[in-house]
Amino acid sequence: MNQSDIKAINELKVLSIDMINGAKSGNPGIVLDMAPVMYTLFARVLNVYPKNPTFFNRDRVVLSSAHISPLYYSALHMAGFNISKSDLEHFRRLGSSTPGLPELNNPLGVDASTGYAGDGIGISVGICMARRYFANMILNEDKKLNLLDFTTYCFLSDADIMSGSADEAFSFAIAQNLNNLVFLYDANNMNSEGPLDDVLPGGIEKKFMAMGFYVDSLKNTENVKEIARAIEAGKNSGKPAMIIFRNVIGKDSFNMGKNIVHSGPLSMDDTANLRRKYNLFLPPFEISKDSMIHLNSQIEERANKTLKKWNDLYSRAKNINSDSLNSILTLLETGNSNISFIASNYKINDGYRESLIDSNYKVLNLINPKSPFFLGGSASEYVTSKTILGGETYQSSKNPLEKNIRFGTRERAMAHILNGMALMGLRVFGSTKLCFLNECLSGLKMSAMMGLPVTYIFTHDSLYFSEEGPARIPNNELTVLRTIPNMITYRPADIYELMGCYENILNKSVPSSLVITRNSVPKLPGSNYAGVSNGGYIIKKEVSKLDGIIVSSGSEVVSSMQIAYDLYQKGLDIRVVSMPSLNLFLNMDKAYQETVIPSSVKTIVIEASSGLIWNRIASSPDMILSIDDFAYGGVPIEVLTKMEFDYDSLKLKVESLLN
């Protein structure tokens, strides 16, 4: 460890503290104790290319711990990425390139957004899954084309280790025998409340060794040579690696080792103390040219070596006449994995009737052969959800090119793993029962924030399957899904709408939630593929006069149409509107909305879910026929009757409201 290393590390510390002090918020403790690790990663290990930051074989860095973000931004700045002094000065400010929780921005060196504690672990695992999949696709074309061998590094804190989704992702990584995955854990045993001895039991090293990780634990966390040795050993271990840094929080601060240094700016005296201790008297937000050159030269020297070998392999690949290989390289270079699925190309027999879960299996397998980049799985629910492609062979280290992923009962990790895979350009899906939505909600929000086209398939969508009891009967989940920004939720009524949903999903670059029933439903008269793109459409037009409108989604459309037919015999002429996507309908222009649902006409909504969001459609709250309480456990028809949501009860309510 030379003086140039020491100086650069100390400048990273002070620069990061300047950012926190300028923002008047942040976490100086982790910045001070992890600066040697961050510097060593960039200076001695990381294969990144500041002049070509989106190069597809670059190493990835994921910050599961948001607290370390000012240190990461400072390192990017020192390394020559497009993070300016002004960006650092605007840390945590509106519209800045340096938000407190990093947001996906590949050109700036930010490979993933940071969410809740532990979320980045699953994202890192997903990136590794995708790397392995692509790497083996390329090697399948030519065994010498090792074009994708990057490593993913994930920074962790004690909070990440305590997260529930963390254990799900860790165990999945071991089950998949992943490699090229290194976790860098700041084990400072402190949060804002104080020491963690009573909430984070010891023996972390033994725990991860027992799981199957490569584990190294460093007490000397300031020695660049030793840190580099540990990281390199983990990288080359052939296993997921956990490198534990037994740090003292807030190293060199007046409050070193105390919880007060966990969060909040340092005092002026403490900041001045650090500058004196490090003999750094540059103005705030300044770093020396010497330190920039010292770090850049190490990164460039390593890059030149790796790129020469890689470019030779890439030239070899480009000379191979293979459409498959070309499509892989194009995806990796552009990030686009377009899949063409045109619903109208398929004819549905008139007598078609089956569970939408069964129909969904068939549609997935119509899409499957269209692209090698379409894959996914379920959280221990494939037997009932049938979200499986082709046969029942699953992806593993022995079968890395299989397209089915067995996530196990890990809904939380599944969503984050899917996000990591989508960051690499794959079109992925994951499924579970709708009642388990809350288990994976954080991952859905991260998909939406990063704009990743992940498809979430939720089955068993209502109280029609009530035998298990209220804890496993959805009630407000549809409302939650429909109110996630930048996500489109679909609830198709039949096979036509289901196929239209998939055409829309594959044509859009935002995440989607597809909610489907286990009910057996017929091909409905008036149903069509194209109506899905508008969100809602007239599935049954009134005969002559318009006495009222019923709006429904999913399997309730079947009941709504029958109610309309029956009440026509009693003199009520009713239009039925199918609403496969309320999100899309509400984004249509007012003229279209008025054409489908005239505001002057009494409009009733029928849906076996919470009715809160339907006040934008129904004429009045009493015209929302919904389920706004926990359901009962029991035989479905008895439960429906008890909750006055059986067919006869609904028909009476509609007749009463329209009369």
Question: How would you describe each model-predicted region?
Answer:
Residues S157, T432-K433, S552, S578:
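Glycine-rich anion-binding loop/nest that anchors nucleotide
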Residues M1-F150, E300-V510, V515, S520, ...:
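Thiamine diphosphate
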Residues M1-L32, L156, D160, G164, ...:
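Conserved acidic/glycine
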Residues Y153, L375-G377, I549-V551:
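Conserved beta-strand elements of the Class I
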